[in-house]
Amino acid sequence: VTGAGTTWVNTGELFVGSLGDATLDILAGATVSNGSAVIGRHSTSSVTVSGTDSSWTTGALLVGGDRSDTSSSVAGNGTLDILAGATVNGTSAVLGDSTDSEGTVNVDGTGSLWSLTNSVSVGGLGEGTVNITNGGKITSTGGLIGHEASGSGLVTISGDGSLWQNT
């Protein structure tokens, strides 16, 4: 999805890679909105949102795995990249939701923002990683790192102006 004025509106749930690998790129001022979303349910999949005025608005987000779906034993690996002044708005997020899954979110560059109205769990039953670099920012109402007993979480914040703000 590329270019200013280009819009994709999906009122339902969005799966980026359920059983097959998938990539979604939101670039150069494009916008996407949907209900809840999963990146890398039982696959290795990614979403990249890049460029000023590029945005993705989603409901609850799972990055890497989906513990509610037991139809496959394949662990999910998901990555969300928010780059170069792009914005992602959501309600809540779990990174590494299912056992043996991996979920990674990278927020890089001045003006790049991941804004959540609720909390983010970095490491559900699997492994979660967040990297906030070079002036990137996350805002949320709570954060859990290594939320579940079998999970693990790692958060790295580096570079001038980089911030994770919990209110």
Roles of regions detected by a PLM:
Residues 1-167:
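Sequence/structural signature of small/polar-enriched beta-strand/turn repeats
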